[in-house]
Amino acid sequence: MAGGPRRGGRRRKKVCYFTANGITHIDYKDTELLKRFISERGKILPRRVTGTSAKYQRMLTTAIKRSRHMALLPYVKEEQ
């Protein structure tokens, strides 16, 4: 393809946000942190997108679900 996108470029290795910043506990009340890992539709972003490790992804998922249950985060965001 003459005008197509280039492929084969090196991708940067994703680094876990929590291990890089020394965060050991994810609090469900910290909604500003949790919003970074939720899509604009309100879905939890997967590890391959965010780069978080498996341990912290499990903790993050639990914290987001608790926060939703306590009505700190919405289950689904409104369409605008």
Swiss-Prot record:
Superkingdom classification of source: Bacteria
GO biological process: translation
Keyword Ribosomal protein (UniProt): yes
Known function: Binds as a heterodimer with protein bS6 to the central domain of the 16S rRNA, where it helps stabilize the platform of the 30S subunit.
PANTHER family in UniProt: 30S RIBOSOMAL PROTEIN S18 (PTHR13479), SMALL RIBOSOMAL SUBUNIT PROTEIN BS18M (PTHR13479:SF40)
Quaternary structure annotation from Swiss-Prot or TrEMBL: Part of the 30S ribosomal subunit. Forms a tight heterodimer with protein bS6.
Protein name in UniProt: Small ribosomal subunit protein bS18
